[in-house]
Amino acid sequence: MSHPNQNPTTGTAYLVGAGPGDPDLLTVKARRLLDEADVVLHDNLVGDDLVASIPECTTVENVGKRPGGERTPQAEINDMLVREARAGRDVVRLKGGDPTLFGRGGEEAEHLARHGVPFEFVPGVTSAIAGPSAGGIPATHRDHASALAVVTGHEDPTKPDSAIDWEALADIVSAGGTLVVLMGVGRLPDNVAALDERGVAEETPVAMVERATLPSERTVTGTLDTIVERARAAEIEPPAVTVVGEVVNVRETVANCLGGAAGETGPAVGLGPVEEEIEVNQR
């Protein structure tokens, strides 16, 4: 049934997941929509190679947000989607990972619905799963983890009205589950402290996978007690995925036979007396 505000000539908005970075991990449907779209509005996390593959006749605009840098306000992005669709154009809103996992796809969908614009979610491979697996770390494992929690690491865990229940997350990790933190590089010390203060053992394995699935991918491993220092020594930068839990140890078992960036080991990053303890894997 059509929306009462919907114009018969209105285009369709597609909220599309671009996957974790490697263009080969783009879904077949996403590829088709990019080839057929009139307009593509993409985020910064969408790789340059993927953007370059969009047909030249398509209007392409970067509406991404950089931490601490320039950004297109979300309200403006919402209005752009409505404006382009009402002009009769099919528009792809291209987001890194999956559009509904910390991608604000739900907010955009609500805005489109309020304005009578037909839309569709097109799922993508989320970095919450692809990031760890690219680094040789399964999100779950029959012998190690039967529970998985995924949270944003961008929120300040010390604020009194935090929407994240760090006590519950600590319980999951302590019980053998896996915690995946997205967008958590800047707040890594705070997030580690939040888990430590709630009883997670210092020796709990932790890994950070930077730019997962891309040629520049790097993986740093450590424990809750050492990961902040190791990540700092390796100069890990966004985008990176943090994995906490016993599944991180699987990497040590499989790394020698793992293909892709995670299977190729680069030089150690020195940090004085702990140089021997730091492993950075890089393609």
Q: What role is predicted for each listed range?
A:
Residues 3, 96-175, 218-221:
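Class I SAM-dependent methyltransferase SAM-binding "motif I" and its flanking Rossmann-like core
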